[in-house]
Amino acid sequence: MGNQEYHEPVLADATTSLLVTRPGIYIDGTLGGGGHSLELLRRLDALDGESLLVGIDQDSYALEAAGQKLQDFGDKAILLRGNFSMVRELLAPVKRGPGEGLEVMGLLLDLGVSSFQIDTPVRGFSYLRDGPLDMRMDPDGPLTAADIVNDYEEQALARLFFRYGEEAHGGRIARAVVSARSVAPITTTGGLAEVVRRACPRKDSPIKTLSRIYQALRIEVNDELGVLQQALEDGFAVLSPGGRFAVISYHSLEDRIVKRFFSARCTADWGPKGLPLREPLKPAEAELVTRKSVQAGEAEVSRNPRARSARLRVIQKL
């Protein structure tokens, strides 16, 4: 797996400049090809003091590519296989070993699918490239998109397309899927794309509909929203005071979860309105570093179109 197969990291300069404040442990919970980690290591090298980069990814191919990209940094980078929702568990032996005595000063989650995964037909993420209907970010995961498309009942499919894809015609597309699979199982990305195209109303863009349907299936296969919520909880827990948490999201479902979590941590609890309290029942646990989400500029979007929908939010633990 060559490094060139992975995309340019989105919002790399903004993310790393906002995240790196002082030496310590920095966690890239979505390592991918190592683009963000490379920029983090370069910034950490410029600081006085000992630092350690911990990269996490559930995809063994990503770990291989990142390992090649970061090899010049030697033992300053530790790469671990696992889901970023397991950050607390994965970090524990690091804190007892090479990271002993270091505080966790930064955590990054880039929630996008890597271009390598999208562009590799056998991974089954894209409607533009025919391949097995898979969509597992962890190649060893138990559930595939084909399982969902061929086994879920029509009502469950419609609910899935509407909830995770925000697709207004989810019911219509679910009926088309059930009808098509009654003739023969739908086992390829191209086969599903053809079913969706035929079911898509003429006035609607088939590309946008396909994007929403494939997003819904990918979220379900990988339990992305549940994993994100767990990662936010555990990620914030492992941060040391003064540590920063940065998340890059790509669609409204993710961004709402991140925004709500960050807002809750940055808000003191004063109890019911009207209580004569001098101090909050529960003080704020963090403060906003970015008041609004940071977005890519025109120059970056022209170089890297996938940056167009990216939203970066950062908080600092108190």
UniProtKB/Swiss-Prot annotation:
Alphabetical keyword list: Cytoplasm, Methyltransferase, rRNA processing, S-adenosyl-L-methionine, Transferase
SUPFAM superfamilies: Putative methyltransferase TM0872, insert domain, S-adenosyl-L-methionine-dependent methyltransferases
Tagged with keyword rRNA processing: yes
Residues given in the record as S-adenosyl-L-methionine binding sites: G34, G35, H36, D57, L91, D110, Q117
Single annotated GO MF: rRNA (cytosine-N4-)-methyltransferase activity
Entry EC number(s): 2.1.1.199
Protein name: Ribosomal RNA small subunit methyltransferase H
Functional summary from the UniProt entry: Specifically methylates the N4 position of cytidine in position 1402 (C1402) of 16S rRNA.
A biological-process GO annotation: rRNA base methylation
Recorded catalytic activity of this chain's protein: cytidine(1402) in 16S rRNA + S-adenosyl-L-methionine = N(4)-methylcytidine(1402) in 16S rRNA + S-adenosyl-L-homocysteine + H(+)
Annotated localization: Cytoplasm
InterPro entries, per the entry: RsmH, SAM-dep_MeTrfase_MraW_recog, SAM-dependent_MTases_sf
Taxonomic source organism: Chlorobaculum parvum (strain DSM 263 / NCIMB 8327)
Main location: cytoplasm
Catalytic EC class: transferase
Database matches in Pfam families: Methyltransf_5 (PF01795)
Similarity annotation: Belongs to the methyltransferase superfamily. RsmH family.
GO CC aspect terms: cytoplasm
